[in-house]
């Protein structure tokens, strides 16, 4: 009798032990919050901290505790897919808990990878005044990038293009907060899926998580110098610069937010608790995670000088509400020692890691099929995406002036046409693209030659370079114009130069470049 009682108790205890050890976090039918708590309860402090840091994809196998995020290298989509499959397979099948990393990629106007479709830049997207078109474009970008393993896009920008000297205007949708909010939320819902769906089901296959940046007031620095301070005041901040981000959170359910490099009214964004916690989470109910701009926490001690060192920067960032450090462990590399020293509570680590894990479960990282390089040809740079890029470009065109109804040009009435300017024979794809090679596009000069053939004589002259003070080509440009019926003058700038202009340097040929790299 007693033996049977003991045996039954043993069976009950064994069943309870098996049930309590069930890996709920691996069950796709369980709720996201339930999966997060189950996984978090199994993690060591070292494993938790690893989730708050980022490394290169090629480094993953050497990391003892894994990494929260890996970065897609700037190579071909086929190579990215191959590396992604290897990295994620190793993470899921050969590490203690099988936690896959989030794979991030630049996808501002197409995936930053060789072979992906290049769409017009954000400033052109905003000029379409067509949110539905931008939503379709973002959906196409997501389809291409997800095929090579990307889980999260470091886009779009919700900055306002209100400072013409600021070097990243091309990345902005425009200057009006309402327009930027409409275009930005359309981009997010195209890339992530409709907010109603993502709130209920997470990120669908073929979609990506988005990152709203740069939070906030980044694009109006003093003197137009990138990273420069902004003096805005709370009313201007809320009315103009916070408005688009609020819409991204409340209406589009954006998954991540990236703080800006600069300071607003004396407080750097990466340690601004009012911005990252009180407003973002307390007022707007943001449930995603805060992802630093590259080196953003390091800037607290080596640029803004509000922290003495990387350790203090880590404390300041974590207290403000920064969950994740990119692009390499620096400040958050000190979290373990800070917890042991009592300067950071493990509960703070848990809070940040919960948010990161929640993003991973939302994106389906534990169940996603591994990327297949063999099927990329079916998805990437498909004809309908190229046609869509052309449609965006066509709708982005803005006619500022048309004296005497000169446009459109009638080739039957022209004998000669001058094509002049430093950008006439150079394709401008915009920044965050994998190529500047004319072979990947059509220059204005080549397009006119193709269109007009031998019917109209084209007189081409470069005239000058975009930078420098050499005026030796001006005479040829004047001559080309004087012997032509009409002149098409192709001016503007290039993204390479804009990255110099906005960083507070001049446009001379030998000007130094700023050492900081923007994300």
Predicted regions located by residue number:
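Positively charged n-region of N-terminal signal peptides that target proteins for export
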Residues: 1-8
């Amino acid at each position: 009798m007693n033996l049977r009682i003991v045996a039954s108790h043993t069976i009950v205890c064994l069943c309870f032990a098996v049930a309590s050890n069930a890996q709920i976090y691996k069950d796709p039918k369980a709720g996201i919050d339930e999966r997060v708590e189950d996984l978090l309860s199994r993690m060591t402090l070292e494993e938790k901290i690893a989730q708050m840091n980022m490394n290169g994809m090629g480094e993953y196998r050497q990391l003892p505790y894994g990494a929260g995020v890996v970065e897609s290298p700037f190579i071909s989509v086929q190579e990215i897919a191959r590396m992604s499959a290897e990295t994620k397979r190793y993470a899921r099948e050969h590490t203690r808990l099988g936690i896959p990393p989030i794979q991030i990629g630049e996808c501002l106007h197409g995936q930053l990878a060789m072979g992906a479709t290049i769409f017009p830049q954000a400033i052109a997207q905003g000029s379409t005044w067509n949110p539905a078109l931008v939503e379709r474009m973002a959906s196409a970008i997501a389809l291409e990038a997800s095929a090579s393993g990307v889980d999260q896009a470091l886009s779009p920008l919700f900055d306002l293009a209100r400072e013409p000297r600021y070097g990243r205007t091309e990345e902005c949708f425009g200057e009006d907060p309402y327009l930027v909010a409409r275009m930005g939320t359309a981009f997010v819902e195209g890339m992530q899926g409709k907010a109603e769906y993502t709130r209920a089901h997470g990120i669908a296959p073929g979609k990506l998580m988005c990152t709203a940046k740069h939070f906030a007031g980044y694009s109006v620095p003093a003197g137009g110098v990138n990273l420069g301070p902004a003096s805005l005041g709370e009313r201007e901040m809320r009315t103009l610069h916070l408005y688009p981000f609020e819409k991204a959170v409340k209406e589009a359910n954006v998954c991540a937010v990236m703080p800006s490099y600069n300071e607003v009214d004396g407080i750097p964004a990466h340690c601004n608790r009012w911005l990252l916690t009180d407003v973002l989470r307390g007022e707007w109910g943001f449930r995603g995670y805060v992802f630093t701009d590259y080196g953003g926490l390091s800037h607290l001690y080596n640029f803004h000088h509000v922290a003495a060192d990387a350790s203090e920067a880590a404390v300041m960032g974590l207290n403000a509400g920064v969950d994740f450090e990119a692009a390499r462990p620096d400040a958050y590399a000190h979290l373990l020692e800070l917890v042991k020293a009592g300067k950071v509570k493990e509960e703070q680590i848990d809070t940040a890691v919960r948010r990161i894990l929640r993003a991973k479960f939302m994106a389906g990282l534990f169940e996603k099929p591994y990327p297949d390089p063999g099927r990329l040809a079916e998805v990437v740079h498909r004809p309908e995406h190229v046609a869509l890029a052309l449609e965006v470009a066509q709708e982005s065109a803005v006619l500022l002036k048309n004296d005497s109804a000169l446009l459109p040009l009638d080739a039957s009435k022209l004998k000669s046409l001058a094509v002049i300017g430093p950008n006439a024979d150079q394709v401008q794809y915009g920044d965050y693209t994998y190529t500047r090679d004319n072979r990947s596009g059509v220059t204005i000069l080549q397009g006119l030659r193709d269109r007009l053939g031998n019917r109209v004589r084209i007189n081409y002259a470069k005239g000058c370079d975009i930078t420098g003070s050499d005026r030796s080509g001006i005479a040829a440009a004047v001559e080309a114009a004087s012997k032509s019926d009409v002149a098409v003058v192709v001016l503007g700038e290039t993204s390479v130069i804009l990255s110099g202009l906005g960083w507070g340097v001049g446009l001379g040929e030998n000007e130094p470049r700023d050492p900081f790299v923007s994300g």
